[in-house]
From Swiss-Prot:
Molecular function in Gene Ontology: structural constituent of ribosome
Gene designation per UniProt: rpmB
One annotated GO biological process: translation
Family, per entry: Belongs to the bacterial ribosomal protein bL28 family.
Official protein name in the record: Large ribosomal subunit protein bL28
Keywords per UniProt: Ribonucleoprotein, Ribosomal protein
Organism ancestry: Bacteria, Pseudomonadati, Thermodesulfobacteriota, Syntrophia, Syntrophales
GO cellular component: ribonucleoprotein complex; ribosome
InterPro entries xref list: Bacterial_rp_bL28, Ribosomal_bL28, Ribosomal_bL28/bL31-like_sf, Ribosomal_bL28_bact-type, Ribosomal_bL28_sf
């Protein structure tokens, strides 16, 4: 299961957790993806998409009812 937004392509970001003792461990931050039924802009068909909440709030996607 890919954790990538179907609209903007936003995916996981890798960095470090840094403790008080300055120990570093790998950490992955995932985008807030929502699985939606959306209308396709070209054909008007209903498709299942994984969309990040930023794209959803910005109005890049039209939700199907």
């Amino acid at each position: 299961m890919s954790r990538i937004c179907d609209v903007c392509g936003k995916g996981p970001v890798v960095g470090n957790n840094v403790s008080h003792a300055n120990n570093k461990t790998k950490k992955v931050w995932y985008p807030n993806l929502q699985s939606l039924r959306c209308l396709d802009g070209k054909t008007g068909a209903v498709k299942r998409m994984k969309v990040c909440t930023r794209c959803l709030r910005s109005g890049f996607v039209k939700k199907a009812l």
